[in-house]
Amino acid sequence: MATWIVGKLIIASLILGIQAQQARTKSQDIFEDDNDNGTTTLESLARLTSPIHIPIEQPQTSDSKILAHLFTSGYDFRVRPPTDNGGPVVVSVNMLLRTISKIDVVNMEYSAQLTLRESWIDKRLSYGVKGDGQPDFVILTVGHQIWMPDTFFPNEKQAYKHTIDKPNVLIRIHNDGTVLYSVRISLVLSCPMYLQYYPMDVQQCSIDLASYAYTTKDIEYLWKEHSPLQLKVGLSSSLPSFQLTNTSTTYCTSVTNTGIYSCLRTTIQLKREFSFYLLQLYIPSCMLVIVSWVSFWFDRTAIPARVTLGVTTLLTMTAQSAGINSQLPPVSYIKAIDVWIGACMTFIFCALLEFALVNHIANKQGVERKARTEREKAEIPLLQNLHNDVPTKVFNQEEKVRTVPLNRRQMNSFLNLLETKTEWNDISKRVDLISRALFPVLFFVFNILYWSRFGQQNVLF
């Protein structure tokens, strides 16, 4: 029995010795291969730790290995990607418009926040065929550098990229070499505004995008075929003083002395909200004009009341006009708001002039009436002398005089008619009576002409 056990141990030791010898032989072969190549790889270390297993080379499917392969194969990010036909690199663009804020009429600019997405093909970055066990795309970090279009915004005044919590940038490389670049940026853009119809105007603001250095021989920008411009949900109703009514995408290729440059343009149509100006400007100014007409019902002798009312309404209208103009830039043309304010001030000023005319006529009539009274007083003695020379028999024929009884209602009607006729014959009172009807009619006609001319830009009715 003991002899059998000893034999088994001897056989086992021989087998272990043979395996150890084989492992040493394989290790020497591995080191010799590594020394020939001049490198020591992770696969060699794995063979040393597991000498009894034959290593099998695994496909490079991890992102790190793919990136290491891409950026150690002579890739030069300073050179634009080559194309099959030698033409320009086609850059497909679409944008997500997130916010529009701070529409400044004085400086003619507005602020916008958007996500810009650009896509192009760089075959130097392709790393395999889809479906061979490799990922569909890899994401680059900030440290990696690849060729990118030199995109800029021609009508931009200020701009910055968002970096909280990390830079809001996405660079995705697909296995066929398609590159997707996405970035979130905020822009302050110039927007030339035409204020002829202010505050019922509709403005057209744009976002231009072009290449700064590459001409159309090198880069061609194209809008994405489907959904080139996307709007964030609720954007149209989030503007405080405007309403986003329409958007469109066009091309704006420019020709300069350095070449022809591809350009894309997004046009944003903004309609000003009229309700604010209706409550803050048009209704108060109408009330001021109507208040100025109250002086037509004052007695012509109420000079302090009529002057105070006219001057107060005129000064109030002037202050309102100054407040509106302080929110607008100085322009060389007449705006709709200028026509309205000018007409209202004209009506108020004419009401004040009407009182001056009435007062002048009344004073002139007073002087004439006083002179006529003095002449009548001077003629009374002469009439009395003539009366004494008339025969008394003329006044004794009382039987020929007939009396007509009048009731109170007929007497009042007669007196009112006499008083109205007297007022109409009084020129100063006649001017007040005409003004009471003429001013409202003229203001109503002006409103019809005004709203038919300027109201068509903004649906009011």
UniProtKB/Swiss-Prot annotation:
Protein name per its UniProtKB record: Glutamate-gated chloride channel alpha
Segments crossing the lipid bilayer: 276-298, 304-325, 333-353, 433-454
Similarity annotation: Belongs to the ligand-gated ion channel (TC 1.A.9) family. Glutamate-gated chloride channel (TC 1.A.9.4) subfamily.
Pfam assignment, any one: Neur_chan_memb
Disulfide bonds: 191-205, 252-263
Keywords: Cell membrane, Chloride, Disulfide bond, Glycoprotein, Ion channel, Ion transport, Membrane, Postsynaptic cell membrane, Signal, Synapse, Transmembrane, Transmembrane helix, Transport
Ligand binding (L-glutamate): 98, 117, 182, 211
GO CC annotation, single: postsynaptic membrane
One GO process term, biological-process aspect: locomotion involved in locomotory behavior
Segments on the Extracellular face: 21-275, 326-332, 455-461
Bilayer disposition of the protein: Multi-pass membrane protein
Gene3D superfamilies per record: Neurotransmitter-gated ion-channel ligand-binding domain (2.70.170.10), Neurotransmitter-gated ion-channel transmembrane domain (1.20.58.390)
Organism name: Caenorhabditis elegans
Gene Ontology terms, MF aspect: extracellularly glutamate-gated chloride channel activity; glutamate binding; identical protein binding; transmembrane signaling receptor activity
